[in-house]
Amino acid sequence: IYIMRHKFGYKKLNRTSEHRKALIKNMLNSLIKYEQITTTLPKAKVLKPQADKIITLGKKNNLQNTRALITKLQSTVSANKVKNTLSKRYESRKGGYTRIIKAGFRYGDNSPMAVIEFVDRDVKAKNIDKKTKETNKDKSPNEQIKKEATK
């Protein structure tokens, strides 16, 4: 039996369109920032082609693509990292910038979990962010404000 492929376009993830777009955008920003995130398997499968398209967009370095990156990610920090770091890392690679590794099942609801990460990722990317958080924890909020004001 053959069925017509109507409404087979994309996974809805049981969310409204705006919620789904926001979810994908937030996950893309987290993936770019930390270069590895743990999420459910269906979300990782939706995120993989989106992340690959973002890297491909960043590889063609022109104003139009820069604006498209900023529009898609809603973050100039993430857009700059894609343009300056990730696009240089993957300039010899034609595609397949991310990989999905199955990571068992979540305790509580038994959801299949997965780790999505960039191929040849920078292992230090996650640690750098943790170090800055730890140094900021040690200081009082007033000291942090003074430090930022002197920059």
Question: Which positions does each model-derived feature cover?
Answer:
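Structured, basic alpha/beta domains of bacterial-type, RNA-associated proteins
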Residues: 3-150
